[in-house]
Amino acid sequence: MSEEVNRPEKEYSASSIQVLEGLEAVRKRPAMYIGDIGEKGLHHLVYEVVDNSIDEALAGYCTDIEVTINEDGSVSVRDNGRGIPTDYHEKEGRSALEVVLTVLHAGGKFDKGSYKVSGGLHGVGVSCVNALSTLLIAEVHRDGKIYRETFSKGVPTSKLEIVGECSDRGTTITFKPDGEIFTHTTEYKYEILSNRLRELAFLNKGIQLTITDKRVKDEQGGYLSETFHSKDGLKEFVQYLDATRGEPIIESIIYLDTEKNGVPVEVAMQYNDSFSENVHSY
């Protein structure tokens, strides 16, 4: 005998359908974009900004990336790439910089001529960081001028301004994560970020990555800081990983670097006498 289930009747009509504008969707469901809103998601914000700089390096336009944990808990990521474009975007009716920072799926990686390879969240990364930050400052050194624009929770709080002149080029993104989103913690851990940058240095040989923590000073009164640079890339990475995993059975590292159908493949491996295997893929 079936038993009738009494459910309170709720109206389900066109008025029930919500359309989230701009970056509202990111703030409404942040875990969909950065994985979670705990410690892992918090640090992922930094990874997304760094990945933009890595894209510039992979394209051959960037050699140095600096990550700074500031005294107020914000993070700055600076590179010496070409600088995010600041000219007027005809379709969007505003600067390209503002489009990149406020529109999902906006970026140079969708243009085949701008990037051959790229990382990050496929065009949503930096805009997500902006949406989940109480403050984001974008500073671009490009074409002899310094451009600056500020944002809060994904919304511009200033117009794009020229604040000076320069002889260098590059982009600096400074952001402070929103405590309303990251309710567990908004404090960055130096070890987590330094491990990530060390890994990126191995994966992208020739690029210099520096991390500085302005919250901590060493015995000499300077800030805690490390610089990572790898000449041999994956070969050095394998040596680093195997340093505490027993004696190598074969001294030389097996290494392959090739390309097929436009897809680059790089492999480095070494046999040692440890009990278990250790495989990393990217």
What are these regions (language model features)?
Residues M1-V50, V99:
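Bergerat-fold GHKL ATPase/HATPase_c domain
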Residues S2-S15, G73-A96, G107-D232, F237:
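GHKL-type ATPase core
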Residues V19-R27, N70-E71, G164-T174, M269-Y282:
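Flexible hinge/switch segments at interdomain interfaces of large molecular machines
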Residues A25-K28, M32, D55, A59, ...:
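Conserved helix-loop functional segments at active or binding sites
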Residues K40-T63, G125-L132:
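Conserved ATP-binding N-box helix of the HATPase_c
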Residues L42-D51, R94-F110, S194-N195, L234-E247:
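A short, contiguous, amphipathic alpha-helix enriched in charged residues
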Residues T63-I69:
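A conserved short beta-strand within the histidine kinase catalytic ATPase domain
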Residues T212-Y282:
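GHKL/Bergerat-fold ATPase module in large chromosome/replication-associated machines
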